[in-house]
From Swiss-Prot:
Disulfide bonds join 127-132. The active site is at 166 (nucleophile), 270, 302. Residues 1-40 form the signal peptide. The gene is fbpB. This is Diacylglycerol acyltransferase/mycolyltransferase Ag85B.
Length: 325
């Protein structure tokens, strides 16, 4: 086979994958905020609070679900998926996360809302099917919320963790890259870790349009804008390595196991994002990184059963890394 033939076949494969993703992805993104699973919602009796935290940058109060880990405890911020709801955080809807981390010495912080936001500070108002609002989520999570929690709930404003699934996995990495004093730990579960590359901006735009009618250009501008690379975890590996951020990176391969998630959309999407995770690992190792857990099992689909299992599995690592006691 000639070099030209190889290149043609390679481009053909990329085109087929990209076309399939463009057709299927908008219908899949709901998986990141789908129906509740067994054991969802915190049980009665747990000390879960429903806070209204002022956000001057967004011009409104933001609902935050909160469970204290004790005075001066480090915080674990659990960030939601693309279809984040305005009533409850997906981690509470779909997993017993508050139960798992009760009396762990860690304060659990679940911001509510932020559909399609990537927990970022948007260039323009976030205008979707429900109207327009200001999205300054990075400012809220790294300034307004930690200050409020420190003053009102005795939570340490530094030495925290950000854990996110799908959309929010890349967000967790970026928060840690640019705010290393606050976030010394970042967990990414089934995320696209090179959103600025290739068809990433176009596919993200399609997904955001389906999840609320939002526009990616309102978030980070056109694909040529520096904001795309600024918010690309793979591009920010040098910062994560220099910060010595503790990382937990998980992605399945689209094959279901006994946990469930046996449906074609969940299988396709997990397999689709896996390659970006493997590339991230290679780039991280090449940059001299040595403070990460990479978990890429030969199973796992894009569904809450697997993300919940990972949150449970990382509990000891979080306690050790954050100094919970």
């Amino acid at each position: 086979m000639t070099d030209v033939s190889r290149k043609i076949r390679a481009w053909g494969r990329r085109l087929m994958i990209g076309t399939a993703a463009a057709v299927v992805l908008p219908g899949l993104v709901g998986l990141a905020g789908g129906a509740a699973t067994a054991g969802a919602f915190s049980r009665p009796g747990l000390p879960v609070e429903y806070l209204q935290v002022p956000s001057p940058s967004m011009g409104r109060d933001i609902k935050v679900q909160f469970q204290s880990g004790g005075n001066n405890s480090p915080a674990v911020y659990l960030l939601d998926g693309l279809r984040a709801q305005d009533d409850y955080n997906g981690w509470d809807i779909n997993t017993p996360a508050f139960e798992w981390y009760y009396q762990s010495g860690l304060s659990i912080v679940m911001p509510v809302g932020g559909q399609s936001s990537f927990y970022s500070d948007w260039y323009s108002p976030a205008c979707g099917k429900a109207g327009c609002q200001t999205y300054k989520w990075e400012t809220f999570l790294t300034s307004e919320l930690p200050q409020w929690l420190s003053a009102n709930r005795a939570v340490k404003p530094t030495g925290s963790a950000a854990i996110g699934l799908s959309m929010a996995g890349s967000s967790a990495m970026i928060l840690a890259a640019y705010h290393p004093q606050q976030f010394i730990y970042a967990g990414s579960l089934s995320a696209l870790l090179d959103p600025s590359q290739g068809m990433g901006p176009s596919l993200i735009g399609l997904a955001m349009g389906d999840a609320g009618g939002y526009k990616a250009a309102d978030m980070w501008g056109p694909s040529s804008d520096p904001a795309w690379e600024r918010n690309d975890p793979t591009q920010q590996i040098p910062k994560l390595v220099a910060n010595n951020t503790r990382l937990w990176v998980y992605c399945g391969n689209g094959t279901p196991n006994e946990l469930g998630g046996a449906n074609i959309p969940a299988e396709f999407l997990e397999n689709f994002v896996r390659s970006s995770n493997l590339k991230f690992q290679d780039a991280y190792n090449a940059a001299g990184g040595h403070n990460a857990v990479f978990n890429f099992p030969p199973n796992g689909t894009h569904s809450w059963e697997y993300w919940g299992a990972q949150l449970n599995a990382m509990k000891g690592d979080l306690q050790s890394s954050l100094g919970a006691g």
